[in-house]
Amino acid sequence: FILFINLILVAPALYYIFYLDVNFLFKSAIYGGEINLKIWFNYFNKLFCISTIALFYYLPFLFSKLSKIDLQKSFNNISLNFSLIILFLIGLYYFNYNVNFGGGGIFFQISNKIFQNLIFFYFVVLISFYILNQIFSLKNENYFLFLLIILSNVQETIYHKYYDPMMIILYLTLFTININSKKFNEKTLSIFAFFYITLMFLYYIKDTI
């Protein structure tokens, strides 16, 4: 039964790829270019970009105080610091996402278009590692689910819109994280509404900033 439901859900994608022959999975991110397998299979690109996108969609939970984190606790954990920094440095060495591809997430675009470098983006990546680790640490299955999200991106490009509003839905459903549902009120809804209005505005001006 589950297999049947999955086949129904995937049917539009199969129709799009095989019948309409719009096979974006095996096309270069740059029009007229060739697929670069070093980029296609570079999961550090996906880890860095998707981590910052996941952080972006967690921000309204923090701003509305539906969820709280204690970064000081993470910073004081020596073994955790060592593991995250080693992961970050390895990823930093292999990261080669091309700004000409487009996408990369809002923080990647801000870093490139406003600061003209990737320093801000790398800073957000590192902060993302700490925050995501803390919110996922409540249950090991959270890490596995996040790994599946990363592996699900099988093409060269990584667009912010791929995860909108999927990440917020996952935070509220499949992820087991510390969210205080009792604090849902009009103020909370206003924060989420403002968040999405800001997001739509950024989508609108992304080609001009």
PLM feature spans:
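Membrane-interface junctions at the ends of membrane-embedded or membrane-associated helices
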Residues: 1, 60-75, 130-139, 174-191
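Hydrophobic/aromatic-rich transmembrane helices and adjacent perimembrane loops
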Residues: 40-60, 106-131, 158-177
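C-terminal transmembrane-bundle signature of multipass membrane proteins
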Residues: 161-167, 171-175, 188-204
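Flexible internal linker/loop segments at domain or repeat junctions
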Residues: 86-147
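Extracytoplasmic loop-helix module adjacent to an early transmembrane segment
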Residues: 142, 162-163, 208-209
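C-terminal, well-structured subdomains that either form a transmembrane helix-short loop-helix hairpin
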Residues: 152-157
